[in-house]
Amino acid sequence: IDLIPDLLVIPVENLKNTLWFDETNLPWIKPSPNIPDLETAIIYPGMCLLEATNLNEGRGTYKPFKQFGAPWIDKQELSIALNNLNLSGVTFKPVSYTPISIKGMSNNPRFKDEKCEGVELILTNRNAYNSVDIGIAALKTVKNLYPEKLKFNSDWMDKLWGESGLSYQL
């Protein structure tokens, strides 16, 4: 960057960093069409990594990032494998769903009009939930169960992750 602008940080008065957004009594404004609520915002930082794979990340449903799957996944097998990891703050429920075009959310989701099997993430303790760890665990588990099926777009994964190599490390 050739020209660095002046930056002025204005502190927020009476802000308590211990509060979740829904504890502030402020209205929720969607930061993205596919982040309709706080729970999705909590889940998103880790589950957005699925965008760099051939998995459906819940787009084309009314639960984007809260569920994921593909036509080649066995929902029971994946649910059991993920729940056996005993990850903090989350359980995984087996689900079947069919991604569709949803105006204003997802025009052409991956596996549009195809039945997908996968899991829905159920937050059980948002204070214990580590979004990025969960996203990595989900990717590792799918890769272990379906090594010939899961594909990565390494360039996109590098951009999402912030450095190169994650798709190879999994």
What are these regions (language model features)?
Residues I1-E13:
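Conserved, well-structured core segments that form the ligand-binding/active-site neighborhood
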Residues D2-I4, G58-Y62, E114-C116:
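Short gly/pro-enriched beta-turn/loop segments at secondary-structure junctions
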Residues L15-I100:
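Glycine-rich, aromatic-lined ligand/substrate-binding cores of catalytic
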Residues G69-L170:
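Conserved functional hotspot residues or short segments at active or partner-binding sites
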